[in-house]
């Protein structure tokens, strides 16, 4: 059983990731929490939590961790300073901590549009921050996967997706399906050292990831 640290565990997508991991036979989740009062929520789920702030020191959060899922984010609608602090610099801190701890894989939740943030003026600063974090991970020396979904919805997941390194189209995908993409990206050698965009589609998540991995 591999121990997985989840940053952003209290967020809408992160909670779904925790639930999937908690029902898995292969993974044991550890939720990264910012406030002590958040611990009870995970204790009720019989999930362990570790206190750590992405705007502070996170090196202690890697003890016993095999792999990491970064699903944290300011949401794109917070102030620019918060976006930079969490989505960019917070991600970098966790990447550094993971590298120092010799973590085996780092799975990043990113976003479509990071290849050219200037194309989306409303989210340009957010996408620039995500791009900075993505590039930092690519150059970190860690094994990684970067998942770049389209617009996230709270619809029930259909477990059917469309993925490619570049999809050349816009669209939506449920948080449920994104959470499964993040968890399935933990498996080796699936999507190792790859970035891919994701939308709702016609293929099962597993077959889509196997196909893009060229296995």
Language-model-detected regions and their locations in the chain:
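Active-site beta-alpha turn of Rossmann-fold NAD(P)-dependent dehydrogenases/reductases
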Residues: 72, 107-110, 150, 199
């Amino acid at each position: 059983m591999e121990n997985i640290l989840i940053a952003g565990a209290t967020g809408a997508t992160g909670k779904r990731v925790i639930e999937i991991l908690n029902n898995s036979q292969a993974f044991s989740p550890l939720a990264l929490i910012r406030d002590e009062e958040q611990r009870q929520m995970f204790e009720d789920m019989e999930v362990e939590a570790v206190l750590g702030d992405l705007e502070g020191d996170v090196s202690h959060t890697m003890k016993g961790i095999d792999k990491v899922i970064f699903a944290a984010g300011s949401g794109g609608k917070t102030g620019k300073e918060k976006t930079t602090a969490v989505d960019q610099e917070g991600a970098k801190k966790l990447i550094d901590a993971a590298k120092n701890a010799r973590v085996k894989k780092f799975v990043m939740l990113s976003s479509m549009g990071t290849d050219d943030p200037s194309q989306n003026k409303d989210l340009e600063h957010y996408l620039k921050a995500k791009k900075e974090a993505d590039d930092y991970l690519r150059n970190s020396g860690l094994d990684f996967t970067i998942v770049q979904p389209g617009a996230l919805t709270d619809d029930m997941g259909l477990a059917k997706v469309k993925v490619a390194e570049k999809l050349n189209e816009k669209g939506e995908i449920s948080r449920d399906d994104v959470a499964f993409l993040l968890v399935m990206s933990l498996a080796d050698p699936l999507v190792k050292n790859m970035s891919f965009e994701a939308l709702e589609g016609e293929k099962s998540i597993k077959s889509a990831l196997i196909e893009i991995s060229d296995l």
